[in-house]
């Protein structure tokens, strides 16, 4: 873990593309000694959404691949475009409200699970929620994981925490943003353990749907 993680400024942002996220390096834990040395020198890390694998670190000297054949990684093009925008200064200063990522890939994955979007939405009462193009760091959850929220929600959460603290109450978040790929990964792991889609849906919302949006 980067030594400055706990003191990391709360204006940090996660930049989002379809398959890869751009994380501030101080917020990530190294999973191997070689990664630790690189992450200690990095300011940004490209992280695969499906399984959390670190794909590349961005150092002052340039891009450092952390996987073989980085150029062939699915979704690397849009992620590098985001990185170019970051280097060009487009993400400095007050940013515009985040737009939303397209949902085309999600529709295909729901079909692969045998789920009809409209039927599931009607049956569950849940709405399909597009991923935002970027998220704000709202602090850390109960397990000290970075808590990523939409900017307005991050401001509201921090204000609620401060107000509660004045009354002597400590508020902890359980979890924040989860990508569609992360949700899909939960399904894939449970399916591999022999559970059916119907059984998984008793515990987890379908990828792209959320019980925490209204």
What label would you give each PLM region?
Residues 1-174, 189-214:
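Extracytoplasmic cell-surface/polysaccharide-interacting catalytic and binding patches
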Residues 178-184:
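Short, well-ordered surface patches within globular domains
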């Amino acid at each position: 873990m980067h030594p400055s993680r706990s003191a990391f400024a709360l204006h940090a942002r996660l930049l989002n593309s379809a398959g890869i996220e751009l994380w501030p390096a101080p917020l990530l834990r190294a999973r191997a000694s070689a990664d630790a040395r690189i992450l200690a020198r990095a300011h940004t890390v490209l992280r695969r959404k499906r399984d959390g694998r670190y794909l590349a670190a961005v150092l002052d000297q340039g891009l450092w691949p952390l996987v073989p054949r980085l150029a062939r990684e699915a979704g690397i093009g849009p992620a590098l475009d985001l990185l170019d925008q970051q280097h060009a200064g487009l993400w400095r200063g007050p940013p515009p409200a985040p737009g939303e990522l397209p949902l085309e890939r999600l529709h295909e994955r729901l079909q692969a699970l045998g789920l009809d979007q409209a039927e599931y939405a009607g049956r569950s009462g849940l709405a399909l929620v597009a991923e935002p193009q970027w998220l704000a760091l709202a602090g850390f959850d109960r397990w000290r994981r970075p808590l990523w929220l939409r900017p307005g929600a991050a401001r509201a959460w921090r204000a609620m925490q401060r107000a509660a603290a004045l009354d002597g109450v400590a508020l902890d978040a359980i979890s924040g943003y989860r990508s569609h790929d992360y949700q899909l990964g939960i399904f894939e792991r449970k399916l591999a353990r022999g559970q059916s889609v119907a059984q998984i849906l008793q515990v987890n919302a379908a990828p792209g749907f959320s019980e925490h949006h209204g």
